[in-house]
Amino acid sequence: MPTKSLERLILEFNKLPGVGQKSATRYAFHILNQSEEDVKNFAEALLAVKENVKKCHVCGNYCESDTCNICSDNARDHRIICVVEESKDIMILEKTTKFRGVYHVLNGRLDPLNGITPNELNIKSLLERIAKDDIEEIILATNPNIEGETTAMYLAKLMKNFGIKITKLASGIPMGGNLEFSDTATISRALDDRIEI
């Protein structure tokens, strides 16, 4: 029977996505076997990320200043916005080194069955960016599942009257798949072969 402190640590690890009881227990015992300095560094890293990381006021990506390094980079093409569901999708797309535009993070996808409606997503600021900036193209890089496709179609409909090019990633990422689990070559091809909607 684990101690109360160990039980609490297992419970906290178990709250992480994709971490079951066995993995949580393994992580907790790993922490127990680490040096005090390693555990302290781990705890400090957790606290630092919570204290220092915030959302970019332009795109919604995570950063440690008011504007993320992508939005503040003048070498990027600010006329092309790639719309993603989550900040982690930006990291995946950036690994391809193919996309040189900027991003917009929705903070989720439409999922009415779970109470996620357009009001819960970061859509209003996207429309404001399109209205005030010189935007030429929106790339909808939502995940190829029912919720992602529904979100892409909803956004395409909303943006139709702006008179800009609206594209989405080409196939190659399997239906029901996730950008997170696709390799960089597949994502690069999907960006290169994007289709207008």
Curated annotation (Swiss-Prot):
A molecular-function term among this protein's GO annotations: zinc ion binding
PROSITE patterns per record: RECR, TOPRIM
InterPro entries for the chain: DNA_Rcmb_RecR, Rcmb_RecR, Rcmb_RecR_Znf, TOPRIM_dom, TOPRIM_RecR
Residue ranges annotated for the Toprim domain, each copy included: 79-174
ZnF segments: C4-type: 56-71
Pfam families documented for this protein: RecR_C, RecR_HhH, RecR_ZnF, Toprim_4
Chain segments annotated as coiled-coil in the UniProt record: none
Presence of the UniProt keyword Cytoplasm in the record: no
GO biological process, one term: double-strand break repair
Domain of life: Bacteria
Alphabetical list of SMART domains matching this protein: TOPRIM (SM00493)
SUPFAM superfamilies from the UniProt entry: Recombination protein RecR
Keywords: DNA damage, DNA recombination, DNA repair, Metal-binding, Zinc, Zinc-finger
PANTHER family linked: RECOMBINATION PROTEIN RECR
UniProt record similarity statement: Belongs to the RecR family.
Function: May play a role in DNA repair. It seems to be involved in an RecBC-independent recombinational process of DNA repair. It may act with RecF and RecO.
Protein name: Recombination protein RecR
